[in-house]
Structure formats: structure tokens, C-alpha cells
């Protein structure tokens, strides 16, 4: 719009040209006169030669402007009035009541806006009072606000007058107007009044023809600040401004009573009651001379402007040397006259801060679902970013998120384009430095560099945050750089807009507790703290006494000794000396929350014979349970660190760090451990316990028997999300020796009680709740931590049973990865099929009722092996020896983790046969051992998809035949193991060799090393998945995995989701494991798994469907095409977005849970669109029910196919549907007429499997069906009550057909969601069915089921009753459906 208007003069050049020009005089009386004069406005005081420069273009081009553009100009200027009112309200400081603001006038008899000729600031004289008896108050605006007001009156209002034109007449004569200059006021027209108003009053709504209303003005208070938990009303804001003016502005109130009294009067407060405070009986501005009253009020305004800093960045140069002729000459010399006007040379005003900046920063860093941990974290971020407190100390428990307290404000500062802020962060150790660099530079929100770069090269103008250690902070080079900051910046960047931001010191308690390093900290006292905008000190272990001593040790004043409010701090004389003399304000979140830290970690104190041996045992157990986890081990000495690293290196990958390493090496090793997923254990001295954030960390082991309470808390605090902490000490050797000058070591006993004592929390010794995560208490631990403890305990019991020593553990740990390990689980609850996994030693799984001479029976999900050869540590049982002509049966039942061998030995001249016939998908192994001259035959007949292994061991001169007959798709292995001097033959294929006869090319039974390596990889992957999805041993679903509560899952539960929900080709491959869709040799399912990965993948896909409409879901299926045959890979892909998906469901389905879970009532009268756009929403409950029964009566009489009718109003006949007696016949009738085929081709049902809709009529909705059938009697009573002829209410299958048809009817869905404003879109059929059965309040406040309202809306959309604009859509749907059907 402004481009269309052409060269409109801008604010700052115009202020310099007119308002700052000493040739323009503004000397005039400061009050309006009784008679209206045309020039009674400071606009009229501007010489004509200057006014001609301001608006000639707009006036000349007025006739060329279209009516639309003129209206756009007028409306745009109206929108600027409210922000200008707020600018004035805050700029004057001493608050107005709203009528004072509303009636500001720059001309006419009510004029109260003037320009002070000396200061060239706008001055306001107002005299509003409830009784009208007060004298005028004079308030002066700051320079910038004066520029805006002056520009608004002299430029924007004149533009608005030109745009509205001479015919504008929106204003009527109101009592607040003082219409003068007319002989007969009754003859004044609206056009005359409108012209007077436009040339007099500032804040108008020209569209409505009135002054700006209070409702419009207060809208800003309701909206801003956006993320404030509670907003002030106008009255509260007035009182707040008064309090600020009374307590904060100026420091001479105590010595100058007139100054104090003037401040009260300017806030419209009477001083007569302030006798005891001010020492005067009464005071008014009329009691002093006129000039004194003016000076008192001007000084009060000046104090406010200085205190608020409104002119701290405001510097103007007056163009007093230029005259009008020069300007006019410039105009004639160039068409671009605005380029010749003198410019204002001022420093760019500082971009204002907002509390919303922190929220924006959080979303940049963590994504759109970002939320603060709690209100304490939100308040502290705002305190650090917004408040003027120059020095802040924070104590929060380890793992609370202290880094975000300064990280988010730093990102917010970096977003300000007017000033470049350079901040510094210092940490105690180099180890922590590497971790901080990684965390703070993520997402690219901040430019982060080592502080060494700054010390050596100076500020580069790009870096937002320099990170260093305490040694850098104390270095002379750093303090010298800070001392010379202003000169360096001015010389390097030629600007003063590069400023020092925050000085942040993490874990600052070390200044006091690290006695041996205190000599190194001496240089910090030389640092110029006053150069920084703010100093922030953070720690998880700094109670008030420690914090105060630490701050004083580096040269600061220390903590505030008493609770001081901002008013006292502002008036403190010490403030003038800078930050170093300012007391630091302490925020102790641990005391505020009254929660003992570290309650989420299970802390175990154990006395053992050998600390390293016990630690190794714990670590190996952890990595067997959680292969991807990490651990930290804290040792006493540097020698012990290196010894442990050398001895443990053969078991897992370790990283070791101690103080004797160089800084670069420490950084490199820490970064390697944090970023490399294969690194398992970090071994070091206590320097590895502070500040490091490792996501996979699950265990901390402390071998140092001299740890003090701070070191203990810091070490345990590394376990952010819970885990195990072991304190290992030698028996009878726990020493309570105190190192000189340091805190004493922790004592034997309750750890939690010692933590409470350290933080100054209330002791609970001997009371309920004393033990929190210690002394065997598990009450406060998370479910994951409790499960980890139980799994560790179970593993310890098994190891004790097997009598394994710690030295043998690694080999058995590796051995368990081999392909010889028994396979115990392969099937899933969803499928009746059994998966088959062959191993090297011919294992057997036989189903019930199989007939076998050598029979092995295994329990559910247990693998059984019948073989003659047993490996080490495997028990062999069930051995039978028969005499001549005997019949042999060897039957074995194997329990968990036991290998079973069934062996039969026959005597001379005995013929033994082992014949097995198995059922579908069985795995059979038949083993026979014969003596001399015996004849042995092992024959197996298998059915489809079977896996058969026949193994024979023959003694000297024996003859062995292993024959296998397999049907289609069978997999056969014939293996012979020879004893001494034995010979064997394989006759599976007489003319072929072993390489050609393998049916499974993946497994090479002759390559043992290859087999072992492959099996180890599979086992490792299996353990990873088990750790990632641990609850699949229970009847869990994907909503539990996402983190929903049980009451939410109850209503969001994804019932009816099975393999048929997935489109063809998605997780539906055959011939593979039914649980994970991998080849049998690569199966990653594990023993005891009740919910397969494939089922989880189905449900995960359903969750994604919940969040997407049809088009988005179709695109999503294309996006995940690489995972169509890999449900395990898809689950990993899905779990990456776990938090985001959870938040999105919470947002999108909040209304759904409110209706279904909390049973919030839906009232049709609350839907404005419904009442206006549908007759149904004005019907009573009785009328809706009558209409519902009538629709079903008509459908029954005409034998109309229900699903097709509700899908697109097609009235095809289907008599078989109405005559069907059971669900099977009903579905067959629908399938016969092609309903399901049309549904898939026309609607989003095509995005599911071909059987999905059909199976809805069989087994998925039992609970809903039961509820519906129980309600049939109620429907009969309703019909009798309504006086209608009782008709049969639709049976369940017809009712379900109706709801399915409505669900896939896109036109109806869009209409219903538009009319019924309380509901939104649902994309899963189960959710739609649940929603349809909630109750709504009709227009007469009677309750009816929502499905009855749906049928009424559907009927209204029928061709005879379709609203305007919808008939063509219905016809199109009908035509397309008939075409498909025919």
C-alpha cells in the first residue's frame, strides 16, 4: 500500500526536518482557548513552506486513488492508533485513566497536546477527574514517542483526511464534543462534525464514527505477553505503574518532599492523607508558583524516562543551519526530494525483549512440541532474560535442565538483529568442556567456539558463545581482553553494537570446595565483571553457605543477606559501582520444590572383598541385559584408572580419563565416549562426574572410598532418567578420613538422609518416607529402573545357580551368542502358524498329537533338540536301552534353557526305526544309534512349509540311511555325525553333492565360524530390540510405548487393528517369521514375547493414520516404502518420533478424550454454524428420534442395502441382507452384490487390506455390540413413548453397516464436522464407532445418541433436502457409485 502511495515522508527524516528545526517555532500558551480558531493546532504552526514539502504528492494524486485504496489507507491508519495509545501510556509513566487517553486532542477547545519549544518533546495537559475539580497535570513524552505522535498528527492524520474526502460524515454530535464556531449548533451536519473531529482528536475509529473504544484498547492486555501465566487488567496495570513511580524512580524522594508529592499528584492521588509520610497537611500544584509546578512535573517525567531508559539510545543532531529555501531548492533539483532531507544520526534503538522470545528459542532447539519442565524453569528463564538483576545464582538438582536456563536466553539474544551479544561460559574441567560444546552447538542455534580462540585472536564478530574452563577464566590474557573490550570492538567493527552478554559459570561451588585448586582461581578477582550485562552462576550442589563463600572468593559481594525486592536494589548506592558490588540473588529450586534430589536413582551401598571384581561382574550383567547401555566407573587414583582400563579392555570397549592427560586428549576422549555408541564404560577420577550428559547411561559405580557428599551427588546426578548407582567399599575398610580443608567423606548409613542434611531439608529419620531410592526402597523409582533392578537380580540368581565364576562370564557371554544356543520363541499370538529355526545340531519341535517312535514334546514357545551329541554345559536326559525285539519310545519334555537329547540304543539283531509324521510347519529331528549288523532307517514325512533334519550316528560297520520326503516349500537338512571308525552316507540326493543339496542358502552348516558370527549378530540385534521394546513380554500396545496413561489408552485403544489393516504388501510377506518378517535364520524374536514386532508395527501404522487425512496417509505409505517388508526397521523409524507423535495425538485428540473419557456434554445449541445451517440442530430430541425410526422403517420396507445407502444415498435393493440370520450370511450377501468392492474403489477403505471392512462384522467390536444389543429394549420403550408404531430396531450388523457407511461418506463427514463444532476429524473406524455412541443434547435439552443426530443430518443431505451448493456433489457421488457398481 505504501509503495502505491508513492514517496511518503518517513518518520525520522521528518522529525529532523520539522520538529528539530529551530526555524519552526512552537511558542504558545499551554492551554486551549475558549473560542475555536482554525490555527489552534501545532500542525497549523508549521510554516507553509514546510507543509508544502510534507504532503504535496498525496494531495495532488488524491483523485487518482481508487476508492478501495482510499479505504485501505483510512483503515490502516485507524489500526495504528491503539499501539500509539499504549506507547503514550507507558512513556508518561504516571498512569492515565482511559478517558484521559481517549480524549487527547491536538486542536480545538479541548486541546491538550502541545510541543515544548525548548526540548521539542510532546507535552500533555489533562484534567480528567471523577468530580472534575482537579487542576491539569503536565506529562512529558520521551523523544522517540514524541516523534511518533508528531508524525501521526502532521502526516498520517492528514493522509487519512485526504483519503476520507470531503463527503465523509460518519460522526454524529455526541456530548463529549465541544462543537464551536457555528451560530446554530442544531444546523450542524454530520459532515461538519466529522471534519471537526478529524482535525481535533487523535484516537479515532473512522469506520465506526467514534473514539477508540475501551474494548479495542484492552485487547492488547488480553493477548500480550503471549506466554504470561496471568495477565493484568487496566486497573491493576495502573496500580503497578504507580508503585513503580513511587518506589523505583529517583533516589531523592526522602530529601525532597515536593518531588515525592508531585509524583503522587501526577498519578491522580491526593496527598492530603499523606501527612505522616510527607510531613505536610495538604499539597497541590496550585500551592506553588506556576513555573515551579511546571518544573516539578517536568522533572518527574524526566526521572521516569531516565529510569526506564527510554532515551538511552536516542541521540539526534538538530538541523538548525538549514532553512526552508535550502530544502525547497533541493526539492526542485531532484524528484526524489526525500533523499535531500537531513537524516537523523542516532544509534539504533535496542530491539525490545519479550517473554515470547524464550518460547520461540525453545521451539528452535527442541521442536514445535517444546514445553518447559515446570513453572520454576519457566520463571528462571524469564528472570535471566528479562529482569534487570545483574547477578543470579541458581541451585537445581542434577539432571534438572540447568543448561537450558541460559541456553534459551542465549538463543533469544542471538535472534536480536540490532545488537550482537557475545557471551562466555566456563566449566570446571576439560572433560565437561567437550560435552558442553556438543550440546550447545546442536541445531545450529548458536555459534559456539572455544574461549582459547577469543584469548588468542580476539572477538571474531560471528561467535555467540565462547566456552572455556576455570583456568581460562583466571588467565591474565582473558581479563585483559575484557578490560579492553570497548576499544577493541570500536576499532575492529567500527560500531558499538557488539556488546558483552552473559558471563556464565557452571558448577561454581568448586571455587569453594576445590581446595587444592584455589590458588589457580586467584586471577578471577581481577576480572571486570561490570563489563558484562549479567552474571549467571549455576550448580547442583551449592547451598547458601557454599554459594556465598564461592562468590566472595572470586571477588563478588556474595549472596543477598536478606530478601531484597527490586525497589531496594535499584535505590542501593552500591549499584552505581557495578555488578561486582551488587549482591547476587539466589534461586534455590531444591528448597522451593522440597523434594530430595536423586530420588529417581536406585542407590546401593555394598561391602565386597574385591571392588574391581564386583564392578566387572555388575558391568557384564548390565551389558547382557542392556547391550546398548553405558556406564561410568569412578576410581580413587589415576593408577587405578589405568589398571582397570587395561584389565577390562578384553570384555568391552572402555575410555579412561584422569587429570594427568593433556587438555586436548581429555576433550577427544570425552567426545568419543559421548558420540560413539560402541563405547561402553568411561573410567576416571571424580572429574568424570560433573556436568556430563550421556543419554544411554544406566549405571554409575564408585570405587573411591573417600567421596564427599558433593562428589556423590554429582556422580549419581549423571543418571538423568534413572538407573543404578553402586558404592563399593572393601569390607571393614570404609575410611572416614578427611582430606585437609575439604568436606568430610560420606558416612555409612542412609544416603538420602545425608543428602537432606546437606541441602538443609527437613529430616525424616525414623519417619515414613525416609528412604528415597536407597536402602532397598523402590517406591519413588520409575518403572524402567525397577524393571532393570529385577532383571539384574534374576540374572544374578541364574549365575549363582550355574556356579559361574566372574572369570568365566565373558566366554559364556560370547558363547551365548553362538548358533548352538537354544531357540525358544518363534511364533506370535496373532498367527496360528509356527516359525521354524534350524540350528547346527538338528533340533526338534513337535506339535501335540504327533505319532513318533522317538518322540520329543516341548512346551509352548520352547525349542527342543533330540540328538546324540551334547555340547558343553548342556544336560542330556531321556536315554532308553531296549532288549531284543523290543519297541522303543524316547519321550522328553525340556524346560527353559535346557538342551535335550533323546537317544535309543538297540542290541544285536534288533531293528530300530524312528519314524515321525509332523503337522504343519513343524521341525523334526530323528536320531538313531545302532550296533553291529543292525539296519537303521530314519524316515520323516512332512507337510507344507516344514523343516526336517535327520541325524544319524553309526558305529563300526554300521549302515545308515537317512531319507526325507518333503512336500511343497519344505526345507530339508540331512546331517551325519560320525564316531570313531564309522562311515556314513547321505542319500538325500544320490547324484548331488552337499553344496547343491542345501535348501537354505543362508546357513552353511559346514562353515562353523560363519554360522557362529551370524548367530552372534542376530543375538545382539535381538538384545537391542528387547532393550528398546522391553514391554512386549506383556499384553502391551503401541500407545503404552508412546507413554499414554491407562485411562487414555482405554478410549484411544486401537482394537480391530490386525494384519488386514495394512495395505497389501505392507508387513504381509509370506514364508518368513510371522513375528518379525525376517528369514528364520535371522529371526530377532525372543523367548516369552507375547506381542510381536509385526503387531507393534501394525499399531504404529494405525497411530500414523490417526494423525493424517486420506491424501496425507497415502503419501505417508509411499514415504515408508523401504519398510514395507521390514516391520522391525519401521518400528525403529517410528520410535525416533516418539515424543513428537505423543504430543501431536494429545493436541489433535484432546476434544475426543474430553468427550469419550471425561464425558463432556455435546449440546447442539453450542454450535452456531449448526443452528444457522441445519434444521436438525433446531429439532427436539423427540423429533430426531422419530426421524431416525422413520428412516429405518423405510429402509426395512424397501429392503435397501444399508451400507451403500449411507455411503452415497444409493437405494439399491438387497433382500438377502435383511433376511440373513447370522453375520456370515450377512457378509456373504454384501459380498455378492459387490458392496465391499465398491467401497474399496470409491473411498479410503482402499488404503487398508481387502478383508479389513469385511472382518469388522466378525470379531472386532464385541464390547460395542454388547452395549448396543442391551439398548434395544430402550429403543422399544422410546418408540412406545413417542406414540409411533413400534418397528424393529436394526439388528447389530445393519447398525454397524450404517456407521461404516457414514464413516466412509466424505460429503456427510465434512458436513457433520462443519455443523457440530465440538467434534473434529477422526480417521480410524474404531474411534468413529465410539464417537457415534456418545450422547448429545438436542435443542430441547433432551439426550439422544449421536448416531441418531448423524442419521438426521444424513437424511437432510438427501437429494430432496440438500442445501444450496451441495446437490451437485451428491449427484456426482451417486453417479460415480452407480458406474462402479454397474
UniProtKB/Swiss-Prot annotation:
PROSITE patterns (UniProt xref): HELICASE_ATP_BIND_1, HELICASE_CTER
Residues spanning the membrane: none
Region (Disordered): 840-864, 880-1007
SUPFAM superfamilies linked to this entry: P-loop containing nucleoside triphosphate hydrolases (SSF52540)
Enzyme class: isomerase
Source species, domain of life: Eukaryota
A GO molecular function held by the record: ATP hydrolysis activity
Domain Helicase C-terminal: 617-766
Skewed-composition ranges (Low complexity): 880-983
InterPro entries: DEAD/DEAH_box_helicase_dom, Helicase_ATP-bd, Helicase_C-like, P-loop_NTPase, RLR_Helicase
Biological processes annotated in GO: telomere maintenance via recombination
This protein's UniProt keywords: ATP-binding, Helicase, Hydrolase, Isomerase, Nucleotide-binding, Repeat
Miscellaneous notes: The protein tested in started on residue 386; there are 4 identical proteins in yeast.
Entry similarity comment: Belongs to the helicase family. Yeast subtelomeric Y' repeat subfamily.
Physiological role: Catalyzes DNA unwinding and is involved in telomerase-independent telomere maintenance.
Protein name (Swiss-Prot/TrEMBL): Y' element ATP-dependent helicase protein 1 copy 4
Taxonomic lineage from the root: Eukaryota, Fungi, Dikarya, Ascomycota, Saccharomycotina
